[in-house]
Design a protein with these regions (language model features):
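Conserved class I S-adenosyl-L-methionine
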Residues: 1-45, 49-58
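Conserved beta-strand signature within the Rossmann-like core of class I S-adenosyl-L-methionine
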Residues: 144-153
Length: 213
């Protein structure tokens, strides 16, 4: 568990209600632009028959799309157990339950307990982790071919929004915090294990970075 919060604080933010909202949005609208950018990049690098490791996959929408495009199997690493009901429902509806393994583990703290995969994905995860370098370095070590992650765009609008959300959590005595980490420093951490940046998508809300080995 990252040092920014205790387990109760984390569970209260990534609650069952949050999971239902994410699941409902995916059913109605499909992938967000950032999630679509992740899926498209991973697919462009060769997804057929690939194994995927998604760190913090939540309700599984990115994984489902990668499996539909030809990935063989996905391992999802999670900290919050509040996603389980919605994730199981989406996987069942997609007929993909047997192709996904869900584990509860923090890869940055226990990297040796996680097997490598062809593709490693982190969507809207780095912003929730205080030690981004440790997380991204661990993710890169586990990527045989491709690493792709999203992060909040480092602009004034996002800084105001994140600051307001963190301020509210401070007032309610919730120690969970979100972060807008330095984009270039994140790239440096991701490249530390022999990977090279081959794709970047910039947007007002979420940026996407893709690396290959």
């Amino acid at each position: 568990m990252p040092e920014c919060c205790n387990n109760d604080d984390y569970q209260s933010v990534f609650s069952g209600r949050f999971a239902r909202r994410q699941s409902r949005r995916y059913r109605r609208r499909g992938l967000t632009p950032a999630a679509r950018g992740i899926v498209d990049f991973a697919t462009s690098q060769g997804i057929t028959g690939a194994t995927v490791l998604e760190i913090g996959g939540g309700v599984e929408h990115v994984q489902i799309e990668l499996l539909r495009r030809g990935a063989e199997h996905v391992t999802n690493l999670e900290i919050s157990k509040n996603y389980e009901t919605e994730a199981a429902r989406l996987l069942d509806q997609a007929g993909m339950t047997e192709r996904v393994t869900r584990r509860f583990i923090d890869i940055a703290e226990a990297p040796d307990e996680v097997e490598p995969a062809d593709v490693v994905v982190l969507h809207r995860v780095v912003c929730c982790y205080p030690d981004y370098a440790k997380l991204l370095e661990a993710a890169a070590r586990h990527a045989r071919k491709t690493l792709v992650y999203s992060h909040p765009a480092a602009n004034a609008i996002n800084r105001v929004q994140f600051g307001a959300e963190n301020g509210y959590r401070w007032l309610t005595r919730n120690d969970f915090r979100t972060f807008i980490h330095p984009p270039e420093q994140m790239i440096r951490a991701a490249k530390a294990n022999g990977m090279a940046v081959t794709f970047q998508r910039h947007a007002r809300d979420w940026d996407v970075v893709g690396l290959t080995r």
